[in-house]
Design a protein with these regions (language model features):
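Sequence-pattern detector for short linear motifs
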Residues: 11-13, 101
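Extracellular fibronectin type III
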Residues: 14-28
Length: 165
């Protein structure tokens, strides 16, 4: 969504106007760019049926992303499976979007309630993420609940954030 700007000028010396200059222009190229400010969520140790989330646990920081481009962006979120004993999507692995700055995105269509994490792309979770400096970032909170049949091992998941205009 690049923009072409055209202009021309003419001078005034208080007695009259001169001729218009030739038309000049410049192009403002669109930049679609997101920075990950916090890219790691660590829940520590959780036992069987244990649960944790980044909104209730004050010492666990959520993902934080910022639009540092110059156009609004849509963000799709998906991840690899966190648990071995359950398929995705499930209530055992969820996310929700939260504004860090008021007016950062379209509240009517953004996933601000707990939503089951999926392992396929295609569902936009953040709509119209603003690019202006005072309202351009958001948190992605994560909630996990250890399934009853889950074996005790180290768990991890890769969360992917895809952007588009």
């Amino acid at each position: 969504v690049s923009f072409n700007y055209y202009w021309r000028v003419r001078a005034n010396d208080s007695t009259g106007y001169g001729s218009y200059s030739n038309v000049s222009n410049f192009t403002l190229n669109s930049l679609l760019s997101i920075s990950i400010i916090n890219g790691t969520v660590d829940f520590g140790n959780l036992g069987l049926n244990g649960q944790a989330n980044t909104t209730a646990s004050g010492n666990i920081s959520p993902f934080r992303l910022e639009n540092n481009g110059n156009i609004n962006a849509n963000v799709t979120i998906y991840a690899t499976n966190f648990f071995n004993s359950t398929d995705m999507p499930s209530v055992y692995y969820q996310f929700k979007i939260r504004e860090n700055e008021s007016g950062a995105y379209n509240n009517a269509t953004t996933f601000f309630n707990w939503t089951n994490m999926t392992n396929v792309t295609g569902t936009i979770a953040v709509f119209d993420l603003n690019w202006t400096a005072l309202a351009n970032d958001f948190f992605t909170d994560i909630r996990v609940l250890v399934p009853p049949e889950e074996p005790a091992t180290v768990k991890n998941s890769t969360v992917t954030f895809e952007i588009a205009s």
